[in-house]
């Protein structure tokens, strides 16, 4: 039986539409995108990866890399909402960080419980098969609404029972890319999938303030590519003067140190300058 294949991406993979479309001939039909980590990090590629994965497959989910605590659930949910992802979206908790406690199950349930209480019921837990086998994640005591996304490489089976998604490789088609078999077709476009909200941009000249954790300056438009990034970075609360310039349908801010995003999810206009 041929199972649906989904990929999971982070800042290490491309965020272009051509990247996601290029995977379709290999049977890829969905994507899980890393959105956040801890309480300070949001993937700089998440917005584009979410939008372009949805364009390519008609469905997309997101995950949070966990370091423990329900305060991370609050942070994750805030980012989910800012991305415009509705309550049909699959949200996953990535449980693999080396700083996690030896027993994680109670904390996992609290994290998922917070999301569930806020109306997000399509939830899953990601972890290595060894964490389940060793009891670090107690499968029997996980919240009943949590689906299982299990990683096990170099084997013919996931290694535990009742798995919903099996991440079977981190080198899909020779690329540095994780891929999974979606046994239950959880990420399947059915016309009811979430539709990311189109980003809104500032179009004015003025004083701006960074509202997210970190944004990068770029040498030129469009704001893409690691080679195009400058070493200049702005952290939350930083202020700068910028002039809005348009590249296609996207506005950016031209500054003395390069080009910055004009996306309203990342910056606030403090004062318009005529």
Give a label for each model feature.
Residues 196-252, 259-260, 265-274:
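Beta-loop motif signature
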Residues 1-13, 18, 25, 29, ...:
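Functionally critical loop-and-helix segments that line ligand-binding/catalytic clefts
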Residues 64, 127, 152:
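Short beta-strand/turn micro-motifs composed of small residues
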């Amino acid at each position: 039986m041929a199972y649906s294949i989904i990929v999971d991406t982070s800042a290490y993979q491309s965020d272009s539409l051509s990247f996601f479309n290029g995977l379709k001939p290999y049977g890829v039909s969905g994507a899980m995108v890393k959105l956040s980590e801890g309480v300070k990090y949001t993937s700089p590629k998440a917005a584009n990866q979410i939008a372009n994965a949805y364009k390519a497959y008609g469905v997309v989910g997101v995950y949070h890399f966990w370091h423990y605590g329900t305060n991370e659930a609050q942070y994750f949910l805030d980012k989910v909402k800012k991305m415009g992802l509705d309550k049909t979206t699959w949200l996953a908790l990535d449980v693999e960080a080396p700083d996690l406690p030896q027993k994680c199950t109670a904390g996992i349930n609290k994290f998922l419980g917070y999301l569930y209480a806020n109306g997000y019921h399509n939830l899953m837990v990601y972890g290595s098969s060894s964490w389940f086998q060793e009891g670090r994640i107690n499968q029997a005591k996980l919240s009943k609404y949590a689906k299982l996304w299990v990683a096990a490489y170099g084997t013919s089976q996931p290694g535990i029972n009742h798995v919903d998604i099996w991440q079977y490789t981190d080198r899909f088609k020779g690329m540095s890319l994780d891929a999974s078999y979606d046994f239950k077709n959880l990420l399947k476009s059915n016309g009811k999938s979430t539709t990311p909200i189109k980003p809104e941009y500032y179009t004015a000249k003025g004083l701006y303030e960074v509202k997210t954790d970190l944004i990068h300056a770029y040498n030129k438009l469009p704001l893409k590519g690691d080679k195009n990034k400058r070493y200049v970075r702005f952290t939350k609360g930083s202020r700068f003067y910028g002039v809005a310039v348009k590249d296609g349908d996207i506005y950016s801010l031209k500054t003395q140190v390069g080009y910055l995003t004009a996306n309203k999810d990342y910056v606030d206009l403090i004062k318009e300058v005529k």
